[in-house]
Amino acid sequence: MKRLEVSNQAKLPTQFGEFYIQCFREKGSNGSKDHLVVFTPNFSQNPLVRLHSECLTGDALGSQKCDCGGALQMALERISKEGGLVIYLRQEGRGIGLFNKVNAYALQDKGYDTIQANEMIGFKDDERDYSVAGEILEYYRIKKMRLLTNNPKKIAALEKYAEVTRESLIVCANEHNQGYLEVKKLKMGHLL
């Protein structure tokens, strides 16, 4: 935990029930990022875990261009019933940041897919780093988990820290995100 500062815990009542929240401040050469963990009290030795990267447009604004907001809502609902945690990483736009994500969206509006758009503005298809999530798992002493994901990169990253069993998280496609979901499946290897 040498590069993380940990906040106190606080209660968070939600539409899904009462959770607790705790912040982890990641310190790095480019400043700091505050990541949030939303969790149920007394989760099991094999909790449900959702590793979720920030998506302002999907999570807060309800964008139909992606499946992020729906995936977060489904995860919170399941975790409230079965116990576990959401590790909410501040890695907007698969790690490119909000400003660049909006520029990528503008290219998508012109017909480019999500990967092509990222590459056109100078980024890889996915710039995220999940090592901080591993440190957070270690903080909570999680050695085994049921990971709510369709992303094989998340599975591989967390297997370095704990035994992972994948549980799928399927959000319904719509006319705005169907192409995006196809790209995630065909070009990024997502298990959809």
From Swiss-Prot:
EC assignment: 3.5.4.25
Protein keywords: GTP-binding, Hydrolase, Metal-binding, Nucleotide-binding, Riboflavin biosynthesis, Zinc
Keyword Zinc tagged: yes
InterPro entries: GTP_cyclohydro_II, RibA, RibA-like_sf
Pathway of action: Cofactor biosynthesis; riboflavin biosynthesis; 5-amino-6-(D-ribitylamino)uracil from GTP: step 1/4
Disulfide bond in keyword set: no
Name this polypeptide is given: GTP cyclohydrolase-2
Gene name of the record: ribA
